[in-house]
Amino acid sequence: MTWLQNITKESKIWIVNYACAIDYYVDLNKQKNSVLIPGGKGINVAIVMKSLGFDPTVITFLGQPTKNLFLELVKPYDLNIVSFISETKTRINLKLLKDEKTTEINDLSPLITDANLTELLTFLKANVKNNDLVIINGRFKFEALEKVLNLVFTLTENVVIDVDESKMLTLLNQSKPLVMKPNIDEFQTMINTFFHDQQSLIAAIKKFHYCKLLLLSDGDKGAYLFDQNKLLFVSSITPKQVVSTTGAGDTLLAVFLANLILKVDLKTALIKATNYASATISKLGVVDSKDKISVITPKSYYL
């Protein structure tokens, strides 16, 4: 089955990311070790897809005095970035590393005026074609997300959503995205149900008909994929070492989408995505073109 509608070689991949960031990693085990890495869900997805031979464009808001630093940090990845003005600085997120755990202190969302948001919407309307893929992810203000979704669903059927928003099902307003990718906590909040065991989670997933493909990440347990007919579970792969879990979910989504575009079957796509997510956990930032990923086959079964 072809999940993406009318995708051709001329189709473009647009990543709408409200708030990119600079991730400042500090290793508390080695107090002198700190690293700055470009971050935010959209940037992470773009870096991974670029490493797989795709050429996505990130559409975002950037603000001074940290805008130039962000652009300098992202330059080695050779990404296409279309930016609009944020009235406040590009975020700096603090990531504290200690004993295989990452403590995250995330900066405030940027201040975006109605006029600046209108510029972004105008750009989307002028550039997105009906055979393009639009990925909406990251932090959004509710009103901005509502406007972006309302517009994008009129432009293409190939819409992917990875946004932590408790009222997401209301915002969809009967529109059906191609893919939704919540993690387990976001999924529970979105459907206002909390699970005490795997069976209750499975039952809830099988009742979820708000998208064509539900890709749900469940931390170190693995990932679920529901295509409105079959529910597939792929167990996680133990990484060689745990450096930081930041970006693992973004990597999972990026690799899954890349394989979807290449018309790889869903099971193989999710297995490959799981391998890449494991590799991301073994480093700072997400996997890129310099990383060599050896694919192993984890446990997988239909539920």
Curated annotation (Swiss-Prot):
EC code: 2.7.1.56
Record: active site: D250
Catalytic activity, as annotated: beta-D-fructose 1-phosphate + ATP = beta-D-fructose 1,6-bisphosphate + ADP + H(+)
One Pfam family, short name: PfkB
UniProt keyword annotation of Kinase present: yes
Binding site for ATP: S217, D218, G219, D220, K221, G222, G249, D250
InterPro entries xrefs: Carboh/pur_kinase_PfkB_CS, PfkB_dom, Ribokinase-like, Tagatose/fructose_Pkinase
First-level EC class: transferase
Cysteines paired by S-S bonds: none
One cellular component term from this protein's GO annotations in UniProt: cytosol
Molecular function terms, GO-annotated: 1-phosphofructokinase activity; ATP binding; phosphofructokinase activity
Gene3D superfamilies given in the database record: 3.40.1190.20
Disruption phenotype: Not essential, it can be deleted.
Keywords, comma-separated and alphabetical: ATP-binding, Kinase, Nucleotide-binding, Transferase
Function: Catalyzes the ATP-dependent phosphorylation of fructose-l-phosphate to fructose-l,6-bisphosphate.
Assigned protein family: Belongs to the carbohydrate kinase PfkB family.
Designated name of the protein: Putative 1-phosphofructokinase
Classification lineage: Bacteria, Bacillati, Mycoplasmatota, Mycoplasmoidales, Mycoplasmoidaceae
Gene behind this protein: fruK
